[in-house]
From Swiss-Prot:
One of its GO terms (molecular function) is 3-phosphoshikimate 1-carboxyvinyltransferase activity. The keyword Amino-acid biosynthesis applies. It comes from Streptococcus sanguinis (strain SK36). Its EC number is 2.5.1.19. It catalyses: 3-phosphoshikimate + phosphoenolpyruvate = 5-O-(1-carboxyvinyl)-3-phosphoshikimate + phosphate. This is 3-phosphoshikimate 1-carboxyvinyltransferase.
Length: 427
């Protein structure tokens, strides 16, 4: 598709779609709780719909009237063996978290996904699950999907040090540990997003978190809840950056989730000198209204413990850095290589084709700013975040057309992205 270029004056208010991480987990916890869980403002992107369909295939009744989702929970012991293979689509979250759920079930299941998911290594989940007594195998020594598995009702607890900072791996092990016979201890490499831990408490379960150490007792039961999903800061990130770099812009984002394990991008914007204010802060819902305006930005260094708190925002942060004066260095982000694409290389290639000066490194990138951008042809390679990053970059392109191939990937997390962009352009 042809993207809008050379745009000025983005103005308006946006309510970004529901948080993807919380949407996935609300379906999982609702299915594993006893009673009827209701979920408002759920994200209806393709990844979350994959999770919803998988739990239907596992015997859970889920109603969705387009406004409210009702989940008739069956508890851990009420899941049924699926009649067919379980389709995870493009969703790494689905396959990893659900493998943890299935670890404590005594039936066989096979999980598969699309071409992109089939290239993503699952060994970081399968290795600890095997230690707990799960039979699980994929393709090659990295356990690429499809994954065939048979869980166990006599799951052994685990004491495990995570070799990578990954909320998905941590959450898979937590779901398994909840079904194990005794106490499990999981130690994180760096603190990652904690939605799973928060929701265990919300659904009436017990979990102890002290710094990077997590303790979970097996054999727990959950009680149905009413869940309202805040807006996704990872989706809001595209508008935060657009508002900062497109001339004469002011964008107001309502009901954005500001869970402390996800707000790294706000710290980066402050470090770069961005004009940004938070209002209507709700400490219980962990949400706020965020306003950004066009700003003079300066380069910064991004690395260490902040990386897990902005891992999904790094593609759009790279674009932000191309419009900042001076050098920005991103390091400790090797996890980007095993996302939907190798996001280090793909981000550099896409933005460099538009005139940026980005050098990919083993664990991040070096970005020289400020650089003018121009037209190019960019392929998302099926990665939703590359698609949205390119659409925002195109707004700055001074000459020639920006053509985006495989733009449908954006529906993974933000089905109404282009409608919202249109609204801001006419705001």
């Amino acid at each position: 598709m042809k993207l809008s270029t050379n745009v000025k004056g983005l103005k308006g208010r946006i309510r970004v779609p529901g948080d993807k991480s919380i949407s996935h987990r609300s379906i999982i916890f609702g299915s594993l709780a006893k009673g009827v869980t209701t979920v408002r403002d759920i994200l209806r992107g393709e990844d979350v719909l994959s999770t919803m369909q998988v739990f239907r295939d596992l015997g859970v009744q889920i109603e969705d009237d387009g406004n409210l989702v009702k989940i008739h929970g069956v508890g851990f012991e009420g899941l049924q063996a699926p009649k067919n293979k379980l389709d995870m689509g493009n969703s790494g979250t689905s396959i990893r978290l659900i493998s943890g759920v299935l670890a404590g079930q005594d039936f066989e299941a096979e999980m598969f996904g699309d071409d992109s998911l089939s290239k993503r290594p699952m060994d970081r989940v399968t290795i600890p699950l095997r230690q707990m007594g799960v039979e699980i195998a994929g393709r090659t020594e990295r356990d690429l999907p499809p994954l065939k598995m048979k869980g166990s009702r006599e799951l052994q607890p685990i004491h495990y040090q995570l070799p990578v900072a990954s909320a998905q791996v941590k959450s898979a092990l937590i779901f398994a540990a909840l079904q194990a016979q005794g106490e499990s201890v999981i130690i994180e490499k760096e603190i990652t997003r904690n939605h799973t831990e928060d929701m265990i408490a919300q659904f009436g379960g017990q979990i102890e978190v002290e710094g990077k150490e997590i303790r979970i007792q097996g054999g727990q039961e959950f009680t149905a809840q009413e869940v309202t999903v805040p807006g996704d800061i990872s989706s809001a990130a595209f508008w935060l950056v657009a508002g900062l770099i497109v001339p004469d812009s002011k964008i107001v984002l309502e009901n954005v989730g500001i869970n402390e394990t996800r707000t790294g991008i706000l710290e980066v914007i402050e470090a770069m000198g961005g004009r940004m204010t938070l209002s209507d802060v709700d400490p219980v819902a962990k949400s706020a209204t965020i306003t950004v305006e066009t700003s003079e930005l300066k380069g910064t260094e991004i690395g260490g413990e902040i990386i897990p708190r902005l891992i999904d925002e790094l593609p759009i942060i790279a674009l932000l850095a191309t419009q900042a004066q001076g050098r920005t260095v991103i390091r400790d982000a090797e996890e980007l290589k095993v996302k939907e694409t190798d996001r280090i290389q793909v981000v550099a290639d896409a933005l460099n084709s538009m005139g940026a000066a980005i050098t990919p490194t083993e664990d991040g990138m070096i970005i020289e700013g400020k650089t003018p951008l121009h037209g190019a042809q960019v392929n998302t390679l099926g990665d939703h975040r590359i698609g949205m990053m390119t659409a925002i970059a195109a707004l700055l392109a001074q000459s020639s057309q920006v053509e985006l191939e495989r733009s449908e990937a954006i529906k993974t997390s933000y089905p109404n992205f282009f409608n919202d962009l249109e609204g801001l352009m006419h705001g």
